[in-house]
A protein has these predicted regions:
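Ubiquitin-system adaptor modules
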Residues: 1-171
Length: 171
């Protein structure tokens, strides 16, 4: 009976809470060897979570699952490695927006820029919806603009989803 309780104990909520905590502290850390060690712990926790979570419970935003599915299904030369690069770029952008919301360069995304074309669009299909989830709006001519204050919680969850998708692409 005790063994049954152990095997059927749902670890997802505990792992998700640990991922939230590790991710938040990771975002607050300065670049250092300790931050790299912390990232390894965070990645390991995400891997454990991904092994037990059904696909519809892996992400905070449905958009994350949509971009991942669309990319794997529709990209002729899809590779998990390259998709991971795209997710990493989105996660880094979100992290920069959280840590430096006053910087004007994070308020506008030119979807024709080298960063967007080579890091995101080349590796993921329809990833602009991740930026829309952060509050960016299309203003025409391939430009996304973030007006008004940054919602740190929303951007944090986009960053976290990007990291979970990054690890998912590596598994």
């Amino acid at each position: 009976m005790v063994m049954d309780d152990y095997y059927f104990h749902d670890q997802k909520p505990e792992l998700w809470a640990k991922i939230n905590s590790l991710h938040l502290s990771y975002l607050e850390m300065e670049e250092s060897p300790q931050k790299l060690d912390h990232k390894i712990k965070l990645d390991d926790c995400i891997k454990k979570f991904l092994c037990i979570a059904p696909h519809n419970q892996k992400f905070c935003f449905k958009e994350t699952a949509e971009v991942l599915h669309r990319s794997a299904s529709n990209k002729k030369d899809f590779s998990g490695y390259r998709a991971a690069l795209g997710w990493n770029a989105i996660g880094m952008y979100a992290g920069n927006l959280i840590s430096q919301p006053w910087r004007q360069e994070y308020r506008q995304i030119k979807m024709y820029s080298g960063f967007y074309k080579h890091e995101i669009e080349a590796n993921l299909v329809g990833a602009e919806i991740m930026f829309e989830a952060m509050g960016y709006k299309h203003v025409g001519n391939g430009i996304l603009v973030l007006e008004g204050p940054v919602c740190p919680d929303t951007v944090k969850y986009v960053s976290q989803d990007s990291l979970v998708a990054y690890v998912e692409c590596q598994v």
